[in-house]
């Protein structure tokens, strides 16, 4: 992941003094996807409002307004939706309790959040195609986790649409997970009311 420091001032405030939100998402891929989409429409990226969701080992969803990435999930450090091996946002109280339970070292907690979290934590597999196929074969837990990941990703996309005051030209999906037609179709069903969805 690469940073881009164009966040709105209000996007940086967390509600916990001393902890500031930073811009840390899949910037290069998100910008490249946004530019490619704009060019395909004969438009300039700097004249568009886009929500770009990178779906891969990590998930990050970002709001792009007039050529600037003004807000986005920090998927590496626990923002937004969970992904194949990252937890995404968690209930803070339960997380604090886990940190002070004596069960885990600091390093173990970091590993549980990034590497052993997300889909991996539930089905011991971080390969979307493998988990999807297990679901098709009747493993209900695999289907449940895929659907929950779609649900949380859709919530993040909706949140970024509000950052753009609902004025969204398109929702763009990118990253390795978009090769799964089921996930793309489910996301389109959930967020298609916001704007046209493109892969």
Feature locations, PLM:
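Adenine-nucleotide phosphate-binding core of ATP-dependent small-molecule kinases
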Residues: 111, 115-165
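Glycine-rich phosphate-binding loop of actin/hexokinase-like ATP-binding domains
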Residues: 4-101
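Predominant activation on well-ordered alpha-helical scaffold segments within soluble catalytic domains
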Residues: 30-38, 92-100, 107-114, 129-132, ...
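Conserved phosphate-binding loops in N-terminal lobes of ATP-dependent enzymes
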Residues: 1
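Glycine-rich phosphate-binding loops at beta-strand->alpha-helix junctions
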Residues: 168-190
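Short, intrinsically disordered, charge-balanced linker/junction segments flanking boundaries
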Residues: 195-199
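Beta-strand segments within the central parallel beta-sheet cores of soluble alpha/beta enzyme folds
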Residues: 47-53, 108-115, 169-173
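Conserved active-site and cofactor/substrate-binding residues in soluble primary-metabolism enzymes
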Residues: 24-28, 32, 59, 89-93, ...
